[in-house]
């Protein structure tokens, strides 16, 4: 996991605002969640051929579509259109506090893995991803908060991780909990439509899912940290669901 066949290239790394177009298929775990009419409403990440992780607030239903292998939404590239058979939402998901903003989608048929489609590694409960570490988020979310529509091509942005203490200075102490991790405030951000998608960090040369795009500034301010569900804290629940299903 976590090793793209096509290498990503991220500027300044050696809902996405002030990002850049990704190298096509260089984030092979990136999923587009779409309504049956093809409208993209959230992102997600492939964690193995049968499972996708996304945000609980995306409200995925079994009639939605899971698209893997996509780069340009406007082209009929070699995508796989998959169906969810079951959706599991964290039992402690709270839409008021936005705590535990994670859902797992079991696919009705497995994704076919290959050059353009492969899973991301999941952060272990014991992993430490330090503040200041440069990580990358990707998605088809708005490139500015008042844009008329989402971009066709997958966007990416490098963002530094931030400590929860520092993040609380922006959002207030009661908003940022231990099941959240913040990143950004450095000139780029996630925006509407990126929700559920990945925040990945490179650890031991593999890309590891550290955050799930959860919430942030309503105007997608690039000087305000965006908030992600903290995968290391939620890993135990993920393992439980995968083991039982």
From Swiss-Prot:
Its main location: secreted. One of its GO terms (molecular function) is serine-type endopeptidase activity. GO terms for cellular component: extracellular region. It comes from the Eukaryota. It is an enzyme of class 3 (hydrolase). It is found in: Secreted, Extracellular space. Gene3D superfamilies: Trypsin-like serine proteases. Residues 14-15 form a propeptide. Its EC number is 3.4.21.1. It catalyses: Preferential cleavage: Tyr-|-Xaa, Trp-|-Xaa, Phe-|-Xaa, Leu-|-Xaa. SUPFAM superfamilies: Trypsin-like serine proteases. Disulfide bonds join 1-121, 42-58, 135-201, 167-182, 191-220. Keywords: Digestion, Disulfide bond, Hydrolase, Protease, Secreted, Serine protease, Zymogen. Residues 16-243 form the Peptidase S1 domain. Pfam families: Trypsin. InterPro entries: Peptidase_S1_PA, Peptidase_S1_PA_chymotrypsin, Peptidase_S1A, Trypsin_dom, TRYPSIN_HIS, TRYPSIN_SER. The active site is at 57 (charge relay system), 101 (charge relay system), 195 (charge relay system). One of its GO terms (biological process) is proteolysis. Belongs to the peptidase S1 family. This is Chymotrypsin B. It comes from Gadus morhua. The lineage of its organism: Eukaryota, Metazoa, Chordata, Craniata, Vertebrata.
